[in-house]
């Protein structure tokens, strides 16, 4: 569970943030100054890394939010088991099963022996691309 903290005002499009316990990639940020004595508010729209679900966060720009630390690794596909793939990390030689991605551009390149890039975020792993 590796996270950092930053303020909502420091978030940029393309950065990552935790919303409702789910790591998300920020796709839109709008900031608005409210009232005479109110503080500026930000509306952050983000898409979940694992679910693909759209999530939003409305908060003051000086509020602290969690930012997940994304660890990028390279692995090799050992076996295709239908819905799952057996992957070997090329640094630690650890083997593990990952769910097969749903993106067509990744699925079309999946074959045993192919090198992949996968991300490890908050104890979960996801295949990002096939090299």
From Swiss-Prot:
Annotated GO CC locations: cytoplasm
CDD domains associated with the record: S1_aIF5A
Gene Ontology molecular functions: ribosome binding; RNA binding; translation elongation factor activity; translation initiation factor activity
Residues the record lists as Hypusine modifications: 36
Disulfide pairings: none
Keyword Protein biosynthesis: yes
PROSITE patterns linked: IF5A_HYPUSINE (PS00302)
GO biological process: positive regulation of translational elongation; positive regulation of translational termination
InterPro entries in the cross-refs: IF5A-like (IPR001884), IF5A-like_N (IPR048670), NA-bd_OB-fold (IPR012340), Rib_uL2_dom2 (IPR014722), Trans_elong_IF5A_hypusine_site (IPR019769), Transl_elong_IF5A_arc (IPR022847), Transl_elong_IF5A_C (IPR020189), Translation_prot_SH3-like_sf (IPR008991)
Any one Pfam family match given in the protein's UniProt record, by short name: eIF-5a
Entry keyword Cytoplasm: yes
Modification note: The N-terminus is blocked.
Subcellular location: Cytoplasm
Keywords, comma-separated and alphabetical: Cytoplasm, Hypusine, Initiation factor, Protein biosynthesis
Protein family (similarity comment): Belongs to the eIF-5A family.
Function of the molecule: Functions by promoting the formation of the first peptide bond.
HAMAP family attached to this UniProt entry: eIF_5A
Protein name as annotated: Translation initiation factor 5A
Lineage of origin: Archaea, Thermoproteota, Thermoprotei, Sulfolobales, Sulfolobaceae
């Amino acid at each position: 569970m590796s996270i950092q903290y930053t303020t909502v005002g420091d978030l940029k499009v393309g950065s990552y943030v935790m919303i409702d316990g789910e790591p998300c990639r920020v796709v839109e940020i709008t900031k608005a100054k409210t009232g005479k004595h109110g503080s500026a508010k930000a509306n952050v729209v983000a898409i979940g890394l694992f679910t693909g679900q759209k999530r939003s966060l409305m908060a003051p720009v000086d509020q602290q939010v969690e930012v997940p630390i994304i660890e990028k690794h390279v692995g090799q596909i050992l076996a295709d088991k239908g819905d799952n793939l057996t992957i070997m990390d090329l640094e630690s030689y650890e083997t593990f099963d990952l769910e097969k991605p749903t993106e067509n551009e990744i699925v079309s390149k999946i074959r045993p022996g192919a090198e992949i890039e996968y991300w490890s975020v908050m104890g979960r792993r996801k295949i990002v691309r096939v090299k």
